[in-house]
């Protein structure tokens, strides 16, 4: 027994095995048994390989934990922009638009904020903003009259402006600080006027006071003082008496309508008329705000065709639109199917030479083209 123990001790010594390891494997000859903690500390202090193994195990546990904690911290510090804020509260944004009678879609909301409004070159940032100055600049571009306007973007910019002017609780922290009021310029104290002594320009002398009359005042005398009195007024020339009572001049719009009735054969062009400077009628195309107001304050043609028909008739009378204006008006107020039905019905009513609806295609296409 002692020989086996001595052989084990010699083998352990040759292969660098510590006595503690011999105790763990049951070598009774190595001395009295020790506790597991004592053996562990002994292995830690005496075996370099054991220390490396333990350090690797600890590192393999700590590295994933630290990575997870760092990722959580980075995600918690994500920068919030006005655009991302509206997307996080999209249900409230849609409810705000619905209360204004319009509909907005998330995909177009993102496209307008990141691309369309940025390319207007009015200072709109890609991440969006609640600044009323930037919103007003974009709104001015959208509501521009004629082909430069963007009626399809009106619901989106009005919803943006509503969030900025009447902000909910989640928008208030992101509102820009109000601008300080501009101080009014202080009035300058008037400087006493100095006498003109310039040698470049002659000084205008003050007018002399009127001279007293040379002759004594005599009311009964027919003579006048030619030096002080003004000559008597000469009687004005009497023109021929008016031949009849004068009628007030007609307004420009009435004159235009009268000329069109008196000269029906002359070629005329109907233009949307509005009063411009000096109360003169001028051509004004439909603005985006006009089309938006007409569409939002009137029912669709499918629901109430009579109301929309009356609206279009009143617009034709008051604005006298061109053919292109009529196409723009129908495109804004009607759907594609409704617009096609209206055009087909109108082509059936094209009058011929006898005043009745004609069936000749060339006359119909010339009078009422589809495009």
From Swiss-Prot:
Q: Which residues lie on this side of the membrane: Cytoplasmic?
A: 1-51
Q: Which GO terms describe its cellular component?
A: host cell plasma membrane; membrane
Return one Gene Ontology term, BP aspect.
virion assembly
Alphabetical UniProt keywords: Glycoprotein, Host cell membrane, Host membrane, Membrane, Transmembrane, Transmembrane helix
Q: Where is this region: Disordered?
A: 171-281, 350-371
Keyword Protease (UniProt): no
Segments of skewed composition (Pro residues): 174-193, 204-220, 230-245
Q: Which InterPro entries match?
A: G_retro_matrix, G_retro_matrix_sf, Gag_p12, Gag_P30, Retrov_capsid_N, Retroviral_Gag-Pol_poly, Retrovr_matrix
- Residue spans crossing the bilayer: 52-72
Q: What is its main location?
A: host cell
The places in or outside the cell where this protein is found are:
Host cell membrane
Q: Enumerate the glycosylated residues.
A: 134
Q: How does it sit in the membrane?
A: Single-pass membrane protein
Extracellular topological segments: 73-371
Residue stretches of biased makeup (Low complexity): 194-203
Give the protein's biological function: Plays a role in viral particle release. Presumably acts by facilitating the fission of the virion bud at the cell surface.
Q: What is this protein called?
A: Glyco-Gag protein
Which organism was this protein described from?
Feline sarcoma virus (strain Snyder-Theilen)
């Amino acid at each position: 027994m002692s020989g086996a123990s001595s052989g084990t001790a010699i083998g352990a010594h040759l292969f660098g095995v510590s006595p503690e390891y011999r105790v763990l494997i049951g070598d009774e000859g190595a001395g009295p048994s020790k506790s597991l903690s004592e053996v562990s500390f002994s292995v830690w202090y005496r075996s370099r390989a054991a220390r490396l193994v333990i350090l690797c195990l600890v590192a393999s546990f700590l590295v994933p934990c630290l990575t997870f904690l760092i990722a959580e911290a980075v995600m918690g510090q994500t920068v919030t922009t006005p655009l991302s804020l509206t997307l996080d509260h999209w249900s409230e944004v849609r409810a705000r638009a619905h209360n204004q009678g319009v509909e907005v879609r998330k995909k177009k909301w993102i496209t307008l904020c990141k691309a369309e409004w940025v390319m207007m070159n009015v200072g709109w940032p890609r991440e969006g903003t609640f600044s009323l100055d930037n919103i007003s600049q974009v709104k001015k571009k959208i509501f521009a009259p004629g082909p430069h306007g963007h009626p399809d973007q009106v619901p989106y910019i009005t919803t943006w402006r509503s969030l900025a002017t009447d902000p909910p609780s989640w928008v208030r922290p992101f509102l820009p600080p109000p601008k300080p009021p501009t101080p009014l310029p202080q009035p300058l104290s008037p400087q006493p006027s100095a006498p003109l002594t310039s040698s470049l320009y002659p000084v205008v002398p003050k007018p002399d006071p009127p001279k007293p009359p040379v002759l004594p005042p005599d009311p009964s005398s027919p003579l006048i003082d030619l030096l002080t009195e003004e000559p008597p007024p000469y009687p004005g020339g009497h023109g021929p008496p008016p031949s009849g009572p004068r009628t007030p001049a007609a307004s420009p719009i009435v004159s235009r309508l009268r000329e069109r009735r008196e000269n029906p054969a002359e070629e005329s062009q109907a233009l949307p008329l509005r009063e411009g400077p000096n109360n003169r009628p001028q051509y004004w195309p439909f603005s985006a705000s006009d089309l938006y107001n007409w569409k939002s304050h009137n029912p669709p043609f499918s629901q109430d065709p009579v109301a929309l028909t009356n609206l279009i008739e009143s617009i034709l009378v008051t604005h006298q639109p061109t053919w292109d204006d009529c196409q723009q008006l129908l495109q804004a107020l009607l759907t594609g199917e409704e617009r096609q039905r209206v055009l087909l019905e109108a082509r059936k009513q094209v009058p011929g030479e006898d005043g009745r609806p004609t069936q000749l295609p060339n006359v119909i296409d010339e009078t009422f083209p589809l495009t």
